[in-house]
Amino acid sequence: TALAFKYFAEQKVDIAVIEVGLGGRLDCTNIITPILSIITNISLDHTQFLGNTLAEIAGEKAGIIKKGVPVVIGEYTSETKPVFRKKAQEMQSPIVFASDYKNQEVSFAIPIENGLEYNTKRYGRLIGELYGEYQVMNMNTILQAVHILTTKAAPIKISEESIRKGVKHVTELTGLMGRWQKIQEHPLVICDTGHNVAGWECLAPQIKSQPCQQPVSYTHLTL
């Protein structure tokens, strides 16, 4: 982590996206003061370190909320929302719950040949190359974060063209892999990094929605 921070500083990056390794409160990335914090979702994972309930895990995740720094919450449950809200109030940090109806940036999305076509509040039609219905929730979070970054007191300039390009070519630009990634078509082979209950709750309906020409016994999953 220290070497990464040093490299970012030497390269004079415009924005460094720092991903927390485990939890948040005690993670080594938490030494920085960001311009925006994002908590995507909470699930039962690494319970031996973070706690046995969603509320306990949310408390660890909420440790990244810094005084006065805006925070976007992608998804929440009845257990986790009060935890995030309380921490944000303590830190006097503006908080936005991206999945609340009033904050939703995406009205709907339809599958297309090369990903998803989103109908969005601020940018109209956006083409995203990542597959999976669960990407709608991710897109809500992303666009809400971009809105905050571009409209805060000292706004960061991000052109609409850059947003469209980033969404449409995310794999090429970032090297992101393993998000409902099609390895081949015949037979259909999918690679996805879903590794916990929450991940499989998203993957299961996606798998079920795929057209299948063979009897069910010919459909295989490899874990």
Which ranges hold each PLM region?
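Glycine-rich phosphate-binding loop used to anchor ATP phosphates in small-molecule kinases
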Residues: 2-25
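Short, conserved clusters of charged catalytic residues that mark active-site
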Residues: 3, 79, 175
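Aromatic/hydrophobic pocket-lining residues that form π-stacking "cages" and hydrophobic walls in ligand
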Residues: 4, 84, 219
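Generic hydrophobic alpha-helical segments
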Residues: 4-8, 61, 203, 207
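Residue-level signal for alpha-helix termini/capping positions
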Residues: 9-10, 89, 172, 208
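Acidic, Mg2+-coordinating active-site environments of NTP-dependent enzymes
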Residues: 11-19, 39-125, 139-161
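Nucleotide phosphate-binding/pyrophosphate-handling subdomain across enzymes
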Residues: 15-20, 28-38, 42-47, 56, ...
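Phosphate- and divalent-cation-binding pockets in alpha/beta enzyme and binding domains
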Residues: 25, 80-83, 199-202
